[in-house]
Design a protein with these regions (language model features):
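Extracellular "leader-to-stem" segments immediately downstream of a signal peptide or signal-anchor
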Residues: 2-17, 21-95, 100-113, 117-254, ...
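Conserved residues at the C-terminal ends of beta-strands
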Residues: 97, 269, 318
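Right-handed parallel beta-helix
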Residues: 118-119, 156-164, 249-259, 272-284, ...
């Protein structure tokens, strides 16, 4: 699909409808302001306004929970403890200030806005042990994957906002096809470590990922037939989507940049009232399954002012696969 998409899209997944809105700009109005102001005008079908989350004024800073910038010390517990604290208090905002922050998986909870200040860079660790294997859904089918860097399940009134950047460390997860790289890129990648298949066409981040690829290509072998202990040895094969929002309501992603995702970047599944505004996604053009946004089985979704430069599809509309669709 298109590598870069910068349009106003208005989606009702209840009827799987999609329409681009028109905008009448005034001399003093920017394109983004025009889109936001006029998004509900001239829609060719009946569509309720997408509800956005609202948060109490209460605010905490991850530094207050022991987070240290610099990219050397894990801030996983500090960030998640800040989120839990705000959630238990009834809601508010967790601020990630400017700086380099190294972390494992972040779990969003109801009534919490995770807000990144300008010049905040959140880098997710490439240590596979930090990402437990869970039951989830990917590419339209239920199955096991590693926990996503950012996730929410059965949450309501949640957001990720601000001007910060999230780096998913996807280069440590994704396989790479030789045909998608220059000779210089390929040679540098192979020299960096990892494993190459017997045909010399695909690079894998470790021996476990290659083993899983060979195993899954055999007739009669299914993911369900492989034990959790076996998957632990092949964990890199179970690369997660970067942002997994499941069965949640009133979700806002705004202003932030996501890059270098292990698989799909943003995957809302079975959500209602989702707004994605002014979000940027950057993945290398050779990234395997590097979709920017996959909206699956959702209802009332508004996407505006976004820039997606992805290694695969920019925006996909999905509703499961086969019997699960």
């Amino acid at each position: 699909m298109y590598g870069i998409l910068k349009k106003s899209l208005f989606i009702s997944m209840a009827g799987t409808l999609l329409a681009a809105t028109s905008c009448q700009m005034t001399p003093k109005m920017s394109e983004k302001e025009c889109v936001t102001k006029n998004v509900y005008e001239n829609v060719p079908f009946e569509m309720p306004e997408v509800l956005k989350p609202v948060f109490p004024d209460y605010q905490v800073n991850i530094r207050d929970f022991g987070a240290k910038s610099g990219g050397k010390e894990l801030c996983t517990e500090a960030i998640n403890e800040a989120i839990r604290t705000v959630h238990k208090r009834g809601g508010g905002t967790v601020v990630i200030p400017a700086g380099l922050w190294l972390t494992g998986p972040i779990v969003l909870l109801s009534n919490v806005n995770l807000h990144t200040e300008q010049n905040a860079l959140v880098t997710f660790s490439n240590d596979y042990s930090l990402y437990p294997i869970i039951d989830t859904s990917f590419e339209g089918s239920d199955g096991k994957r590693c926990q996503s860097p950012i996730s929410a399940l059965n949450a309501e009134n949640i957001a990720v906002t601000g001007q910060g950047v999230f780096d998913g460390a996807g280069d440590k997860w994704r396989p790479v096809k030789k045909m998608k790289m220059t000779d210089r890129q390929w040679n540098a990648l192979v020299k960096s470590g990892g494993e190459v298949d017997k045909d010399g066409k695909i690079w894998y981040p470790d021996a476990g990922a290659l083993k899983a690829s060979v195993l899954m290509s055999k007739k009669g072998v299914s993911k369900e037939s492989i034990s959790t202990d076996e998957w632990e040895e092949m964990k890199a094969w179970l690369r997660p989507v970067m942002v997994s929002i499941r069965k949640s309501k009133k979700v806002l992603l705004e202003g932030v940049t996501f890059k270098n995702s292990p698989a799909w970047c943003i995957h809302p599944l079975s959500c209602e009232s989702l707004t994605v505004n002014d979000v940027k996604v950057f993945n290398p053009w050779y990234s395997q399954n590097g979709d920017a946004l996959d909206v699956e089985s959702c209802k009332n979704v508004l996407i505006t002012n976004c820039l997606f430069d992805a290694g695969d599809d920019a925006i996909c509309l999905k509703s499961g696969r086969d019997e699960e669709g």
